[in-house]
C-alpha cells in the first residue's frame, strides 16, 4: 500500500 525498503511500492 506504500513504498518502503521491504515491499518497494
Curated annotation (Swiss-Prot):
Sites bearing Cysteine amide, chain numbering: 9
GO function term, MF aspect, one: hormone activity
GO biological process terms, semicolon-separated: neuropeptide signaling pathway
Keyword terms: Amidation, Disulfide bond, Hormone, Neuropeptide, Secreted
Main location: secreted
Tagged with keyword Heme: no
UniProt keyword Secreted present: yes
Location of the protein in the cell: Secreted
One Gene Ontology term, aspect cellular component: extracellular region
Cysteine disulfide partners in this protein: 3-9
Tissues and organs where the protein is expressed, per its UniProt entry: Stored in pericardial organs and released into the hemolymph.
Protein role: Cardioregulatory neurohormone that increases heart beat rate during adult wing inflation; has no effect on beat amplitude. The effect of CCAP is both ino- and chronotropic.
Protein name per the record: Cardioactive peptide
Organism: Carcinus maenas
Record lineage: Eukaryota, Metazoa, Ecdysozoa, Arthropoda, Crustacea
